[in-house]
Amino acid sequence: MFWTLYAATHAAALLQPPAHVAIVGGGWSGWGAAKALIENGAKVTLLDAVPDPTGKTPFLTPTGKPFEAGTRGFWMDYPNIVSLVTSDLGLDENAVFTDYTNSSFYSPDGLEATAPVFSKGAKIFGQTIPELPSPLGQVVATVDLFERVPIADRVTMLGLLYGMLDFVRDETTFEAYDRMSAHQLFIKMGISKRMVDDFIKPTLLVGLFKPPEELSAAVAMELLYFYALAHQTAFDVRWIKSKSITELILAPLADKLASYKLPIPPAQGTAGEVVAVPEAEAALTVLGGSFVSGLQLDPGTGQVSGLTYTDRATGEKRSLEGLSGCVLALGAKGMKSVVQGSPALARRAPELCAAASLDAIDVISVRLWLDRTVPTRTPANVFSRFEELRGAGGTFFMLDQLQDDNPTLLWGNAEPQGSVVACDFYNAGALLALPDEELTRILMEDLLPVAVSAFGEAKLVDSYVQRFPGAVTWFSPGSYRKRPPLQTSVSNLVCAGDWVRMGEREHGAKGLCQERAYVSGLEASNALARNGHLGVGMGRQHIVIPIRDDEPQVVAGRAVNKALADAFTANPLVKALGLKASPWVR
């Protein structure tokens, strides 16, 4: 019976035309979805506004030098991306990523703090110490790494420990934390103003791209928990070792997926008849420079059946029809555009209208080519408390240190002259209107030489500036319920991206995180497969590797807190008085 059913299902799968799924948006989430869909036998059309979403065509400045928008790190707990690089693409991990590196925080007063590399053995007073349980290990390892913040202020960070154990006690509690700003929570938990201003605020500005007063307390706690509490080594970070992330990882992935062919159904003919075998069709079509303006729903089924887009090269409006499913791998800005152009979808999926109402964050990326090499303590660095930032978060990365195997690549294959510095401004709305020359002047005169004096001796050889208005998700207070779900109200429409709520498929990677974006793409494909939209026999689920288990003392702390809170709220007197287990949130 089993084999009969299997044979019938297999035959049906071969005879049916492959499902055709459109992916709107590239990046980690779009390519994650493409990978899982194509490996499941689907036909995929990926549309993105950038000219070449595959990464095969590197972006060059007008003077022929390489440029990448934003410098993004790869933290210790990125198991799915590491598996993609090593197992799926067969790349040498050490050729793709740098070693884990230290990071430095600089203010107008100079060096403020240095982040250790825990996996290399943290040091205290010059002596290497063994890995200690979290959070004890982090506290001990950073004793002598803060240059100016007094110990009395650092100790107040302990007030956050309870919040990190408490905020995920249940969905209701999480939403209560989400409605509160991180700034309010820090006050209620007794974190000193100096600790917030000198360390936590700059960290959030470059981690979630907004200051504490504009961030959801729940998402801030997620970030701090994921990177700082769950494991001592979770904060260890490394970087792309050459060229760009798109060239080293996404381009090989696109090449591999482009080699897939759709299955050819068995030839149908009468006995003795010679039947021509059709040529296998490529499983992947990539439409770069394509702006999707709307989705069409089938009036009968209420499912996505097509979309319209504009070809940037020609200005021509085109359509894609006969879709079996669709993945929206978009941020808030892209979601707003698609929903506004899709009246039927807006009526059917109010959750996407809510997502489209959320705001996003402005980003500016600057790359500087200098006439001499500038030595720094660490290759990755953060600006803190500089008035010239106008409320933005700022980072600078010494690419000549991170990508030192072939420095000529950083200079467009010309003879290297000195350091190449990648600088990013987040929450950069107050800087957007400044001309390029003023942004480079601020960096060369007001920021870099104050952080590292040797920059004062360097002269600018070349520079390039790009602005990205509304480019990044803003996790504002109360935004959780408005973030798009993995599965929408339209059964064959799913969402992917670091801001997506994955529900029962929730992953341990949190915040503005490449791992989370990639995993969400895999899970978006899995959702279409589970719901039968890829066809009979195409329900295969792409494996998603979970984050390693939290350290046992952290798990125990959460369990004890939940047990006590549940017992407290179950008390009849507590119920009668309307008391809360976490009275600082509501």
Label each residue range with its predicted role.
Residues 19-46:
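N-terminal Rossmann-like FAD-binding beta1-loop-alpha1 element of flavoenzymes
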Residues 38-61:
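Glycine-rich FAD pyrophosphate-binding loop
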Residues 40, 240-241, 251, 269, ...:
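Mid-domain catalytic core of redox enzymes
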Residues 86, 93-218, 235, 530, ...:
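Mobile amphipathic helical/loop "lid" adjacent to a hydrophobic cofactor/ligand pocket
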Residues 152-295, 302:
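Active-site/ligand-binding neighborhood in enzyme catalytic cores
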Residues 1-14:
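N-terminal chloroplast transit peptides
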Residues 116-121, 310, 369-370, 375-586:
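Conserved flavin/dinucleotide-binding core of flavoenzymes
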Residues 56, 64-97:
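Conserved FAD-binding subdomain of flavin-dependent enzymes
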